[in-house]
Amino acid sequence: MGDKPTIAISHLGCEKNRIDTEHMLGMLVEAGYGVDTNEELADYVIVNTCSFIEAARQESVRTLVELAEANKKIVITGCMAQHFQEQLLEELPEAVAVVGTGDYHKIVNVIERVELGERVKQVSIEPTYIADETTPRYRTTTEGVAYLRVAEGCDYRCAFCIIPHLRGNQRSRTIESIVAEAEQLVSQGVKEIILISQITTNYGLDIYGKPKLAELLRALGKVDIPWIRMHYAYPTGLTPDAIAAIQETPNVLPYLDLPLQHSHPDILRAMNRPWQGRVNDGIIDRIKTALPTAVLRTTFIVGFPGETQEHFEHLLEFVQRHEFDHVGVFTFSSEEGTPAYKLPNQLAQEVMDDRRYQLMELQQPISQKKNQQEVGKIVDVLIEQENPESGELIGRSGRFSPEVDGLVYVKGQAKLGTIVPVAIHHADTYDLYGQVVNN
């Protein structure tokens, strides 16, 4: 035990990457390795990288260069390792191993081989692995919240997206496996489970022959957990049955993360999402009718090649009309290896930046209005942090997802990791403010 090296993990990227990080930590701890939060003291640093867009790659490269300059032994995992395996080994002598997105479960074996002097390249050409409830896991989120992956990979081929190349085709877990992991998380004190995959509404299509999201939600409804939240609902997959399951299952929050990407049919066709333009409005209206309290989050890409001022104004009008609760806006990032990389009529970065600014400026008063509607209500809040200086508590209500949405700043007494009633007395564009209601 004592002679095994210590390992630190630097986590970058999305919550799917976070789950991979947590499984690697779990496997290393189970194998007797010491895990150190201090990268300077650790013998090895695993950098779980992101390669989704250029900005994410730059952050990953900065982290790798800083560690290389500090002469750390680096194990590179994640999407960048899958994407640029040869290049990374050539350019970073300090990299002792690269491990692909479908190979992180071999991390203990990789470290053992490195310890014997091998420089390891463990990258499957086509990632096929998916962890389940039997895979060790060491959670890194706050005590009350956990991500639960229902599927990995993606069968869609949106023109701007490199994810299928980096994470493979969709592979779903069984309903039984997901429910078993949910039960494990409840036993650890988790109060909120966030279901994730690339397209959660396509869950089960590969193993059951048709999407089974509705059945999954109903099965999770029998688990003793207060909040179940769903990320990444592809709009065309929100069938009447899926919406009914959200309606009927009390612990499933009426929170829908719909990555719409654009509103105009021309741009959606160019994005290789041709069917979406016909259904955007109808699905949003159907959700609002069936789930009047639904919280809607979406993301848009501005500056996709060929986006004219007319296309952009269509998007502005769409956002103004539908009044989403939360909106994320990205400028188009031209990714080598995607169809969009070679499209004509690429827009200048300053035009894209200006459009992003305009769309965010349009959304801010809408977000403010939506938050303002919470003032005067008593809402359940999951308490996650305490400010040691002021004693103020920080948490989230059901309308806020971790990291991407706002927070609730709370006065009063409550234990971390518990859900308590809070009277909301103030709101701003992104956050809410309130007082614990003592029974």
UniProtKB/Swiss-Prot annotation:
It is found in: Cytoplasm. Residues 140-369 form the Radical SAM core domain. Its EC number is 2.8.4.4. Its main location: cytoplasm. GO terms for molecular function: 4 iron, 4 sulfur cluster binding; aspartic acid methylthiotransferase activity; metal ion binding; protein methylthiotransferase activity. InterPro entries: Elp3/MiaA/NifB-like_rSAM, Methylthiotransferase, Methylthiotransferase_CS, Methylthiotransferase_N, Methylthiotransferase_N_sf, NA-bd_OB-fold, Ribosomal_uS12_MeSTrfase_RimO, rSAM. SMART domains: Elp3 (SM00729). One of its GO terms (biological process) is tRNA modification. [4Fe-4S] cluster 1 binds at residues 14, 50, 79. Binds 2 [4Fe-4S] clusters. One cluster is coordinated with 3 cysteines and an exchangeable S-adenosyl-L-methionine. Catalyzes the methylthiolation of an aspartic acid residue of ribosomal protein uS12. This is Ribosomal protein uS12 methylthiotransferase RimO. It comes from Nostoc punctiforme (strain ATCC 29133 / PCC 73102).
